[in-house]
Amino acid sequence: MTSSLVGSEMCIRARCRIGRCDTAIAADINPLPLERGIETINNSGLNNRIEARLSNGLEKISGDEADDIVIAGMGGELISQIIENWEFSKDRSKHFILQPMTKSEELMRWLFANGFSVIKRDCCTAANKCYTVILAEYSGEVRTVSESDLFLYGLDPKNNSMHRRFIEGCVRRLLKQAKGNPVCAETARILEESFK
C-alpha cells in the first residue's frame, strides 16, 4: 500500500515505521519545507521507502500511486481545494486522512456537499492545541447537515475529553464571531449543550 502526504512528513514516516504503508510520497508546494522533509526522511533511514516531490497539492501524484492520502497542517478550505483539484479524488478506493489546522467545519461542509462520507473522526493535540482528524472517502452521497453537525459530526464531547476540548475551542471561536452573526451564537449554544 502506498500513501501520499501533503503538508507534514511526520505522519508518513510513522505510517511507514509501523507498517501501515510500504512506500509513500511526501509532497509540498514550497522547496524549503520539502528540503527539510527530505533531510528528516534521510535521517530516519526511510529514504528507500519515502519519495519527496515538489507538488502543488496532489497535482504531481497519479491515481495509481496512492490509496491513502494524508493532507495535514493547513486550513480546511485549502484541504478541500486540494481534494477538489485532484482528478482522482472521486475514486472510491481512495481514503483521505485529513487534519485541518483551522476551519474544520468548512472542510466538513465541503466533504458532505461534494459526495464524501466521513467514516471516522477523532481529535489529537500538537503544541498544546487540539485538532480534529477526519477519515473520509468518496461515496457519491451528497448530504446537508446542520451548522452544529459540521462541528460535532462523529465526535462525542460528553464522554471523550479530547473531543470536548476540541469543541470548547470551537465554542470560544464562535462566541468571538457571534456579535455580528446570530448563527454563530446559536451554534455555540448548541455545541455547549453537547457536553453538559
State where each predicted segment sits:
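Single conserved hydrophobic/aromatic residue that forms the stacking wall/gate
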Residues: M1-I12
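Conserved SAM-binding loop of SAM-dependent methyltransferases across substrates and taxa
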Residues: I12-C21
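Hydrophobic packing residues within well-ordered alpha-helices of enzyme cores
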Residues: R15, G37, I50, I79-I83, ...
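Short helix-capping segments at alpha-helix termini
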Residues: G19-R20, N42-N47, S89-D91
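Residues at the starts of beta-strands that form the adenosine-phosphate
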Residues: D22-T23, R49, H95
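S-adenosyl-L-methionine
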Residues: A27, P31-A66
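Class I S-adenosyl-L-methionine
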Residues: E59-K60, E65, E77-K196
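Short SAM/SAH-binding signature in class I
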Residues: A66-G73
